[in-house]
UniProtKB/Swiss-Prot annotation:
Protein name (record): Inosine-5'-monophosphate dehydrogenase
HAMAP family: IMPDH
InterPro entries registered for this protein in UniProt: Aldolase_TIM, CBS_dom, CBS_dom_sf, IMP_DH, IMP_DH/GMP_Rdtase_CS, IMP_DH_GMPRt
Any one Gene Ontology BP term: GMP biosynthetic process
Keyword Cell inner membrane: no
Amino acid sequence: MGASTRFRRQSGKVPYNSTAASVIIARFPHRITFGCPRPRGNENGMFDDKIGDLGVTFDDVLLQPRYSEVVPSEVDVSSQMTQRIRLQIPLISSPMDTVTESEMAIALAKEGGLGIVHKNLSVRRQTEEVLKVKRSANGIIVNPVTLNPAQKVSAAAELMDRANVSGIPIVEDDRTLAGILTRRDLRFLEDPDMPISQVMTRENLVTAVGNVTLAQAEKILTEKRVEKLLLIDEERKLTGLITIRDIDMMKRYPRACKDPQGRLRVGAAIGVGDYERAESLIGKGVDVLVVDSAHGHSRNVIETVREIKQNKSWDIDVVAGNVATAEGAADLIAAGADAVKVGIGPGSICTTRVISGIGVPQVTAILSAVKVAQEKNIPVIADGGIRFSGDITKAIAAGASTVMIGSLFAGLAESPGKMILYQGRTFKAYRGMGSMGAMVKGSSDRYRQKGTEAGKLVPEGVEGRVPFKGPLSDYAYQLVGGLRAGMGYVGTRTIEELRRDAKFIRVSAATVRENHPHDIAITQEAPNYSPDVHSGDAG
């Protein structure tokens, strides 16, 4: 094996095909080669290329420690999701109907990651979920929701719930400020048909004219002891809004993932050819679209990506997938994808590999995609197979820029899955988008079975439960803490250095057993390790 190969034998004394061989992954980005023996072909050589190189996944490798002067708390874990979107932590929540809606997306964006709202919703409902995220935190709200004084208070109550706001500026038809209406004004009203003009606050409105910095706004709000500062021009027309809640949020979450207007970033999934959904989401400020398919290396996905990117008026970043080969990544990049999502079948709830016989072990898939993606400076997202924080470190060391999380986030308080009490323990429902329930609800197009009646669907996923883990903030801290620790062991200060410099060693099945706690009965679980995950037992 040449010096350019990704893996190398440690010693010439070990037989080449021995299962005891230890193989080191050399410098990024060359592909894995293990010299897996291939069947002999006939005189025409028709079988010569039937079996490719041996593939590996997360449990098959470990990162080698190196001399380090890096302290884990000092590393920079920010990374590119696309060329225009940089995350402060390299975590993205999966567009699954038991993982990501607005609550999950808000919580993750506050921590510095990004959530992708699933598409098993109507266009209107998915758009509303995106709007909830965009309106949950702002610097200066340039286009706040407003109502007219003649409208009914019932319309105000409905808008507050839908937009997740506690107060609404009231303006005349020409945008002249007339007053403000808050939830407190509606609390004891019995007549829902009463006009807003009879309830709203008209006098002593706290306003500011012209450009106002957030520091100036905070001073005004503190002095006046109010929660909202209305921004107006010289003609008293409403130009924006600043809230004390948003100022407090920016102080509490300084690493939040925000757009140039100070709003939290959010993504949304769409199906192939779903341009109506794409247009609606883009119109409401979504930051990135994910063309979501089980087989991203297909004509319909490629055409969808190309069509969206050629529409210059949309000007939106597009993530496309899923793929598991260099060829798949190359074709999506050629179509205009701003990031490529890698992973076919590694997810805990996915049965694609056993039902269809298709897939590539995840580390090998990442390495293959990165080999071509890096030439175009296109980030790779590792999607699936992440069971521990160490797998995040391995995925990035293999060349991914970020990882997409499903099962680990499904058990969090912010996920939309329902709570389940089973044998005295609390769980949350979790299902694959290829499960029968999810496909019936709307995800059948992801598996190229759109329009198929329920009795004829061929599922590629299962439904189950995962242990309840509490709030995302605590859990994300542990995941990122594991990544920081790994970077400290390897001696890399940034995600880019980890991708470039880390080296792997291939391990045996005995080593995998040795990796986990052994020869002990665990009496107190750690917040970042569950023996249930290792054993595959969900309770």
